Regions:
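Conserved Class I SAM-dependent methyltransferase catalytic core
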Residues: 1, 132, 184, 249-274
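A detector for short, charged/polar N-terminal pre-domain segments
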Residues: 5, 244-248
């Protein structure tokens, strides 16, 4: 990661105040690029991930640290590093702060395409998300919630909408939950890259059996949950307080998702549901 956001390299607190994650010296792109075609590239990348996590507590246990795996082709790894080095000047300061976020989103989208139908579990096309956000029109100091947040695209577009309407993109409270561990990590990284402060809970968890935001009342709920999802542990939740309109059927989670969202909606809140 090369962008220094015009803040002094050594001033970690300044980065934190600006909601920008700090990249220590051993994790900066010049260090990685210099080692691209050495036998130690895997170790260099693992050390970079560890250093970033050490200086950014919100990313603790989130970044991959298996690049030194002997089964991983180090020549291919070096070639991937070269692609970024030759395509983007990762060393200069003042890089468009949205560039890395857009790059990250691009790769998530391509990965979702390769996964086929399974890719919909963690990625909703940005055009769909933008449509939801344009309809709901989130505002500054609002609370936005996604109970099946995937890689966090709903939050990215909400922050962009607020910024585009002369608001402060940091003045948004983001809450999400995700059951898949890898996807939860993707969302955490997405928010860090975008400079969005988010509460996704301390770990991944099933939204129905372990609601990580039990008292939340959100102003906006945007979601593309896995409909027709079953089994969803209905038998363990028969007396749950979220089922204001009756216990949802065990056959699929459609009405469980809808009632969960209604339960977490503020009195004047709005829901955007795919």
């Amino acid at each position: 990661v090369g962008s220094e956001m015009c803040i002094r390299d050594s001033d970690i607190d300044a980065y934190t105040m600006e909601n920008v994650f700090f990249v220590p010296e051993e994790a900066r792109w010049n260090t990685i690029a210099d080692a691209a075609h050495t036998p130690e590239i895997g170790i260099v990348l693992d050390n970079a991930m560890k250093a970033i996590e050490a200086d950014n507590k919100k990313l603790k246990n989130v970044l991959p640290k298996n690049y030194a795996n002997p089964d991983l082709d180090k020549q291919v790894l070096g070639d991937v590093v070269d692609i970024f080095t030759n395509s983007i000047d990762m060393s200069k300061t003042g890089i468009d702060e949205d560039l890395l976020g857009r790059t990250y989103e691009y790769f998530i989208a391509r990965f979702a395409e390769k996964e086929g139908a399974g890719g919909g579990e963690f990625y909703t096309p940005s055009s769909v998300v933008r449509t939801l956000v344009e309809i709901l029109k989130p505002y500054e100091n609002c609370r936005v919630y996604d109970p099946a947040c995937g890689s966090g695209g709903m939050f990215v577009q909400s922050a962009k909408f607020i910024e585009a309407h002369n608001g402060n993109r940091s003045a948004i409270s983001v809450y999400g939950q995700e059951a898949n561990a890898d996807t939860w990590k993707m969302a955490k990284m997405n928010m860090a890259i975008r400079g969005i402060d988010a509460d996704f809970g301390p770990y991944q968890a099933d939204t129905f059996t372990k609601d990580l935001h039990p008292t939340l009342k959100a102003d906006f709920i945007l979601a593309n949950p896995p409909f027709n999802y079953h089994p969803w542990n209905q038998e363990k939740l028969l007396s749950d307080g979220r089922w204001k309109y009756g216990v949802p059927p065990a056959s699929n989670a459609n009405y469980a998702w809808i009632q969960h969202m209604i339960y977490h909606l503020s009195p004047n809140g709005k829901i955007g549901l795919v």
